[in-house]
Amino acid sequence: MADSAGATEPIHIMGAGLSGLAAATILAKAGKDVHVHDVRADSGARFDGDFQALENWSMDADFFQQLEQWGFDASQFRATEFQVVDLIHPDDVITQPKSDRIAYRIVERGTAEHTIDQGMKR
């Protein structure tokens, strides 16, 4: 919001997870004054080295290419690419659909330097 003199108030984002960090980065690149707040001391602190799959099959664009377009450096964090997905059906049958491109990536979450949380924070 702008006051009567045209100055804008800072934008406060609650949560330093991936969505909060992405929103803050995009707003800051647009010239906004952004403050990110989180209940924990650091981005990714709730995960402590957990792994997360980031799916990549539901859109035509590659998610890491989108990150690059948004101004993130995907080389800042480790990711392992997979083209096969193991699907376990209710009857315990396992199928393995394959993709010609990257179906998903496993990333590490947390406070270590190589995690996606810290890469996006930088």
Each language-model region and where it sits:
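N-terminal Rossmann-like FAD-binding beta1-loop-alpha1 element of flavoenzymes
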Residues: A2-V36
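Conserved N-terminal helical subregion
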Residues: E81, D86-R122
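N-terminal FAD cofactor-binding segment of flavoenzymes
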Residues: I26, A30, S43-P90
